[in-house]
Amino acid sequence: MSARPPSRLPRPPDFEALAAAAPASADRRTEVLALIGHLVFSWSNNESLFIYVLMLLLDTDEVSAAIVFATLNTTRARLDLVQRLAKAKVADRAVAGELDDLVARFSRQTKLRNDLNHCMYTVDAEGVITHTQLMKLEERGGRLSFGRVRGMDAARRAELAEAIREHGALNRDLWSFLPRLEAHLVDRRPVDRSPA
């Protein structure tokens, strides 16, 4: 009988040691989790505002726009629809440019949100979240590797805090833009000249 080869699996965590060490690292862990939670909360609120952009571009009601929004099952598909409808419906270059900018800003934030939602989190022996590893394959030099690893250091936490601030600004800018988009589209609405 041949010897069994060594396991290729990572060693499981020492759960008892982590549980014992967890209280001492709770503040740091809570800080990281609060940043991630705030980012996801802000991102979701901003994505939902695109329902109103769709409502205006489709010249429909809120429920119908939400149905279209929910039927498209990826953020990219939703933003693509917004951009295509804008090309068909928005004639004012300033309004179109502002919408393009809002979509671009949201898309940049979507990458960070996806990175944090679709990763493995590494904790050290004290229970501190030290790294993230993306849950996707990357090709480098013709070789596939499993997801990029990034530290959860002070610079990364500052990046998250800045992204949250940007989401706050984006939220205000989206709310400010919606009435301008509505006014532009109302001005372009064809006049019904059919007999009564």
Question: What spans do the regions from the language model cover?
Answer:
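Acidic, Ser/Thr/Gly/Pro-rich intrinsically disordered interaction regions
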Residues: 2-41, 48-196
